[in-house]
């Protein structure tokens, strides 16, 4: 399988409402089409994740100008900003209980192309069962999780990133102040 095939199979799986295991610019993640309520529910279930712990969405870089720097950064926006100003089409079970939503622009050609072809944000959360350590590489992903997702993107060499830690997380408060949640 080549990169073009991997992208097409991933987009097809997402359009069919499937959950996926895929590489990002930080660590391997599991995700789904952010517009698909049922797929988001299945993602919470397969990770055994409490709904109080929201998941972030990856968005296409051409539409967003958020942060720049050496380390990928997830921004958590309050509902009044992401809902009214960002025009995101996402499932209603994706934002946190307080209405906030984590958003990141991935610096990863595979993710960018999948998001572009899908035409929608991609849910992203670490490829681990809730409460367990995040895997630093594909070989550390638990077999149980690989069995639970509907589609696994193959670990092609051109898809692997040298970055092996989660993104920095900054929460934007309604008044515009910023709080660093994960440096």
Residue ranges of model-derived segments:
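Active-site-adjacent structural elements in enzyme catalytic cores
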Residues: 1-183
């Amino acid at each position: 399988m080549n990169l073009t095939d991997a992208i097409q199979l991933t987009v097809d799986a997402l359009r069919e409402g499937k959950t996926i295991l895929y590489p990002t610019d930080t660590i391997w993640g599991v995700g789904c089409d952010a517009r698909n309520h049922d797929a988001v529910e299945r993602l919470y279930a397969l990770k055994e994740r409490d709904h109080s712990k929201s998941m972030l969405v990856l968005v296409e870089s051409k539409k967003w100008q958020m942060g720049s720097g050496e380390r990928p950064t997830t921004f958590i926006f309050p509902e009044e900003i992401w809902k009214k100003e960002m025009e995101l089409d996402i499932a209603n079970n994706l934002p946190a209980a307080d209405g906030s939503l984590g958003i990141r622009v991935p610096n990863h050609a595979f993710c960018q192309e999948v998001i572009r072809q899908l035409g929608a944000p991609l849910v992203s959360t670490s490829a681990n069962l809730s409460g367990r350590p995040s895997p630093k590489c594909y070989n550390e992903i638990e077999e149980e999780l690989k069995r639970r997702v509907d589609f696994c993107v193959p670990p092609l060499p051109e898809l692997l990133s040298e970055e092996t830690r989660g993104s920095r997380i900054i929460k934007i408060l309604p008044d515009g102040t910023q709080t660093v949640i994960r440096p």
